[in-house]
Structure formats: structure tokens, C-alpha cells
Amino acid sequence: MKKTPKSRVQSSSLRSESQARNASRTGKSIKKAGLNVDQLNRLSAAIHQDVEADLYDGAACIVARHGMIGLHEAVGFANRAANRPLHIDDVFNILSVSKAFTDVIVLSLIERGELALTTRVGDIIPELNARVKEAVTVFNLLTHTAGSPQALFPVAAELMGNLDAVIKAICPMELIAVPGQSVSYSPLWGHALLGEIIRRLDRAQRTLRDIFQNELFGPLGMKDTAMGRRKDLSSRIVPIVAHDLSFGNMSAKEVEEHNRYITEDAEIPWMGCVSTVYDLFRFAEMLRRGGELDGVRILSPASVKQATTVQTGALANDYYALMMEKQGIKPPPANIGLDFQIRGEGVGPNAMGNLTSPGTYGKFGLGGTGFWVDPERDVTFVFLRSGLLEHLNDTARYQRISDMAMAAIL
């Protein structure tokens, strides 16, 4: 957890890499994409100011429109305590953004006819608790409407990367609500089961790491993305450091324990992937383009549309509601698609900002990683931050940066 005094790298050295990266994307090329150069410069300056003010430690960011990148930079520190600067190709633990990869592979199984949204989870994992077997479907898992137990740490730390051990621990667990009647974000339980479904349906009996690599990361050219901390990426890993002392349902110490879970051979389909800002941009671009990128089709447009359309009606997200009510904030609708978060109508605390269109969708990880796509304005935004923040603080910082990014759209 962050207790060290501020370290500083000269502003000129913090800026040098982003300036070099963006030099070829200024002027006419940015204007062709319908982006405001001056506003992108303001956004860049705001991120530098945040880091210099010690609001967080560093950030890697991409702003693009029509697939053309207008801003691509890394600012600040990968590890402030070690005075290690953040580089554009540094590899982040993206935590719950990993769920989006699991979602896409589940959707691809549905397209192949091997699974359905209405499939009962117990038909594939029969050792589940009887009530779960009878009532919970794949749709419930994807929409966080299963009534699932929170189960943040169902096994000892050294076993969190062992999916077999996790599944054995969560299968007997009881539901805490009637499936389909409420929304409560499931940090672990739901996507652990989805990952196990992927494994059990794989005829080649591959590891989950290999399935993700062969079916998603490889085809999309996401060369610096992996489930688990691949050995060749280890020198570029950005450590998980808690900038805030409390994270609601977790302490700062528990947040930093994630560094222990995500090992080279870990299989953690709810939070165990690592990636770079550019690789995550490629994934988001695939979604923006209706499931295809560079001639490689991962999903059909129909699946992307369904996944990024609100499936939870007006229900609030109970997982965050109490936290918001304590701060005097009225909880908004959950606005969850097939796990993807949708911006929705109205004004309020929102990581996607209040300037994005209502159909904007994305995925976010604990304390500072995420992406969103505005399909109406054809914008893709990725922001990965070092120095993780508590949920409401994180949302406020993300909202500010997202609104500044949208202000660059002409």
C-alpha cells in the first residue's frame, strides 16, 4: 500500500515518450479523425498534473476515433516507490477487465452452438449446490443476476490461481438471492464458473491459458496479453499498488495480495490477465467494429450488440448501492449487458463520463484499469492507471478523464 513520500522524475522525461509517440499523429492526421488537437493536449496535461499532484502514480492512455489514434501516451510511474517510470509498452494487471475476455469466449461458444444463454450451469458443472443447479443460467452469470455469494477469497492465497481449487470451494456455496430478481456484481463466483464452463466444453482439453491465447489473444495480435504473468513479460509488469487505504469490501493489503495470485501459471478468469494499453485497444477496436479486426472475426455483430445492450432493466447494482448511499449518492440503474457496463441515460457518477452517448459500453477493473467504446461517435478510449484507487474515488478520476477525452470529439 502506498505510504512512501512522493518520488519525482523530471517532467521533461515523463513527457518525452508520449511526445515521440504522438509526433506522427498531430495536425492533419488527428483532424482527419475528427479530433481536437488542443483538447487532446489539455487531456495529456491533466494526466501529468494528476501524477505530479500524487493523485495516482501513472497512466497509459489511448484516445482514438474511426480507428485512428489521436493520443497514445504513458505518463508518470510504473512504480513510484522504486522511481520506475511508466513506459508505453508496460504490462498492467488488468484485474476485472479480464472478465471481458471470458465473456467473449463464452459468446463464441454460443455462436458455435455449444452453449446457450439459457443453459443451466448445473448441466455442465453437476457438482454445484442443488439450488444453483436448478435455477442459475449462463445468462444469470453474465448479467450478475444469479444471486451469487460474494466469495472474494474462497481459498488460501497460494491457491487463488488454481481454478480446480476455486471451483471445488465455491460449488457448495448457497445463493443469497433468488436468481433473476436482483443485480449484484459478482467479483469472483460468476466468472470462475464461466471459466470452468469454457474448460469443460473444450474438446481438446486445453488449459484455460491456452484457450484464451489460441482463440482470442493470438488471432487479435495481442502479443503482450496473457492469462497469468507470462515469463517474457515479467520485466515490464506494473505492480499492483494501493494508492488509497480502503477499498470498501477489501483493505489495501488485500488489494496488493493480488500480486501473489497472478503468477505465470495462474488460471483466473475473473481477474487474472495482464495486458498493455495498445493490446487492450485492439480488443476494444474489435468490439467497435462489430466483432472483427484486421480481417479476423471473433464474434458476429449480433453477439456484440446483445452483449453491449442493457439486460438488467431499471435494477440497481446492490454490490455498489450501499457504498454509494453512505456517500449520499442515489444508486443508478446497474446498466449491465452481458457483463459489459453500459453508460445509460442521465447524469451521475460514471467512469465513462457524462459526455459519452447513452449506448457507450466498456469494462473496468479494480481501482484504475478499463476501456470504453462510444458506438454513436465511433470513439475508443483506454486508460490504465498505476496506483489503484477506492471505487468512488476511482470513478471520479475516470469520469473526469473520460469527459475530457469526449471533449476532443469534433
Map each language-model feature to its residues.
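Polybasic, lysine-enriched low-complexity intrinsically disordered terminal tails
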Residues: 1-21
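Short, contiguous pre-domain boundary segments
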Residues: 20-32
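Short, conserved catalytic-motif segment at the N-terminal edge
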Residues: 31-94, 116-119
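Active-site SXXK
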Residues: 41-48, 67, 90-119, 193-201, ...
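Short loop/turn microsegments at loop-to-beta-strand junctions
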Residues: 57-59, 70, 207, 367-370
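Short, surface-exposed loop or secondary-structure junction motifs
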Residues: 79, 131-355
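Short, glycine/proline-biased beta-turn/loop segments that scaffold the active-site neighborhood
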Residues: 116-131
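Low-complexity, glycine/alanine/valine/leucine- and proline-rich hydrophobic stretches
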Residues: 344-391, 403
